[in-house]
Amino acid sequence: SGADTVGFDCSGLTRYAFAGVGVLLPRWSGDQYTAGRHVPPAQARRGDLLFWGPGGSQHEAIFLGNGRMIEAQQTGVPVKVSPVRLSGMTPFVTRVIET
């Protein structure tokens, strides 16, 4: 999992995106869930990490604002912009970069 010659899984996409601005995230989504400050989803800002599953272990995406997110659903499937899915989302989003 992560990034390979085929593409990204969800945690690989977030690691790649944040590395582009000099922030090194842990490899696994559950570890990324605890890598920043937790804020309620209603206070999400562009660039915050969204998570699904217990402790953020099942999936993650990057919040883009206006109810949209960018995600890699699995390796080999194109990265896409999607509406934010609230079902199964963790009670907090993770803010890694404070502005």
PLM regions and their residue ranges:
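Aromatic- and glycine-rich peptidoglycan recognition patches
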Residues: 23, 34-39, 54-60, 64-99
